[in-house]
Structures are given as structure tokens and as C-alpha cells.
Amino acid sequence: MVHQVLYRALVSTKWLAESIRSGKVGPSLRVLDASWYSPGTRQARKEYQERHVPGASFFDIEECRDTTSPYEMMLPSEAHFGDYVGNLGISNDTHVVVYDGDDLGSFYAPRVWWMFRVFGHRTVSVLNGGFRNWLKEGHPVTSEPSRPEPAVFKATLNRSLLKTYEQVLENLQSKRFQLVDSRAQGRYLGTQPEPDAVGLDSGHIRGSVNVPFMNFLTEDGFEKSPEELRAIFQDKKVDLSQPLIATCRKGVTACHIALAAYLCGKPDVAVYDGSWSEWFRRAPPETRVSQGKSGKA
């Protein structure tokens, strides 16, 4: 089966703790804290500076993105990504482990996992349970900054894992791909607002199916088993044997869909990078669906 040859998308806290204890963090193994929080809530970089997994570097998703785009969190260029992660000591031969400090156990880490994959890097994993469970289990932390020796990372964009506005618009006619939206149900339906969004009504792309990403996580913040993940997709009539595009608001939690499908043996889920924040501003009104007070979004 295909999932038997896929690189492990998850590593356990126990595995990472043992790897750190045995001195494996270095050019062949790098750890990244990819935390990000809504403005006015928590300060990701400050929290990293106060405590983080020993040897971890801070991956600033605000810096490693296309800052010229009017849309949120769009992918950087190949050169930008390669330079950014190279400065974190990551080469094309490095195993990268990503975590974040979100209370859910995982929020932004799957986005960075997907970013590495979309830029051609196979050996990347998410820390299952995140920093939340690293702390809960009593593993070591440090405030000591990580200063890895810079490395060379050649990024090669894998366009099959990325979808553009034009491709999603065309898909409304061709229906070659299933379209799955990972946001909370109220935001998908248009009955709850998009948080911290100015000029962005909630709602969804016509024809998309709602599978909230939090369904993939246990109450303790771990990824559910492949069997449980398959059942979630099946319950929403999402066929993992067929092509699939993941979307959300800004291309972040959509990566949870890509990760969950990967754990079920499906590595080819594409993410619509602009997601709802782009669709709302560019798409024809009849392709935007909302149950909110204004009808169409």
C-alpha cells in the first residue's frame, strides 16, 4: 500500500526527546517552533525566547511568506524559502521536525510541514501532540537561542500540491477535484464571523464540503488514528481515492486536511493557497455561499 512508503509525517514526543538526549540535533535533524497567534493574544516569538524545545529554531511564518501579496500567508518564492530555511541550518538532507505551542496541540505546524513538501522536501514531520504535550510530559525546555550553522537548501516547487484561484474556479465547471473546507462550521456556513478579519465576510466556495480540522485532533491534542481519520472523511462522503483540494481562510488549517489524508495513505492533496480570503475578494458572487444575513457572501 502507498502509505507504507511515505515518509513518517508524525514523530512522538518520546522519539524527539530521545533524539535530543542522544545529540542528534544538528545538520541531519533540525527542530522548528512554528507558533503563530492572532494579534493581541499571545506573542509567539517572545514565548519561544522564554522556553522552547532544546535546539529548536523559530520559524516565523510572517517572514517566510509572500509579503507583496494582498492575501494572507501566501507562499514565498522558491528562492525566499530556500534562503530562509537554509539560514536555519536546514539542507535538502535534513530531517525537519515542526511543532507549535497552540492549546489545541497543533495549529500552524501542519502548514510548515506542507510548505516543506510543496518545495520538494520529503523528510519533514510534525511533532504529534505539539509543545502542549511536550510540556505536559515533562520533557526539557530551554531559553537558550539556537544558532545553527547556515546550510544550502534548494527549493523546487511541486505544483501538484498547490492550487491557484484560476484552477479552483475552473474546477467549479470540471469538478475534477473534491473541494474540502477545514474551517469551523459557523464560518463555513456564514453564520459566524471570520475572526480578526476586516472586510471579509464568512461563507464558503460553492460545492465545497466542510470537514473542520479540529475533528482530526483528540481532546489531548494528538492526531487521531488513520482509522479514525478515514471514518471522518467517509462520514462527509469525501473519497480519498479521488483528487482533492483543501481550502480554509488563508491556507493554514487546510494543511491539516493534507496531513490527515497523508496519514491515510493519500499524499497528493493540493492546498488552495489563497483560500477564502482570496476567493471572497476575487470570485463571482454566485460562487460564494453564505447563510449569513446578506445571503451570498
Swiss-Prot record:
Tissue-specific expression: Expressed in numerous tissues.
Residues modified by glycosylation: S35
Effect the entry attributes to changing R249G: Unaltered rhodanese activity; increased MST activity
GO cellular component, one term: mitochondrial matrix
Phosphoserine modified-residue sites: S38
Annotated compartments: Mitochondrion matrix
Principal location: mitochondrion
Pfam families: Rhodanese
Binding site for substrate: R187, K250
Protein function: Together with MRPL18, acts as a mitochondrial import factor for the cytosolic 5S rRNA. Only the nascent unfolded cytoplasmic form is able to bind to the 5S rRNA. Involved in the formation of iron-sulfur complexes, cyanide detoxification or modification of sulfur-containing enzymes. Other thiol compounds, besides cyanide, can act as sulfur ion acceptors. Also has weak mercaptopyruvate sulfurtransferase (MST) activity.
Protein name from the UniProt record: Thiosulfate sulfurtransferase
Source organism (scientific name): Rattus norvegicus
